[in-house]
Amino acid sequence: MLDEALAIVTAAWSGEPVHHRGEHYTVDGVRFLPRPARPGGVPVWVAGFPGKPRPLRRAARYQGFFPVNLEHPDQLAESVARLSELRDDPGAPYDVVAALPPGTDPAPYAAAGATWHLVEFPWDALSVDAVRSVIRDRTG
């Protein structure tokens, strides 16, 4: 279902009408205007569990991977290595996101291949002060 939806969305970014009859979706003449300013459209980061083959195969076809429930840098390194094998052009720019709790050192994740570090606040303890603290720590 997701693969089919992504194919429709990325085709619609061309600005040309998209006609599609698939297993899950049917669209006739859909297009997105204005087209994305970035050639090729908006970067797509695919989320998935590290080490699971299907999300990694899907992520390899797009511009980034956002692993969920990442527990340690080794998981990320294994996923990055597998993505390098799966991608058509492993040398092309590619984003790998590490979402980590506040106070977690992002350096081991960067060494494992993360290109983005997002602070993952606990949903049940989110506060404005906690967010301000992280911003203050990151910006000096």
What are these regions (language model features)?
Residues 1-140:
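Active-site-adjacent structural elements that line small-molecule/cofactor binding pockets in enzymes
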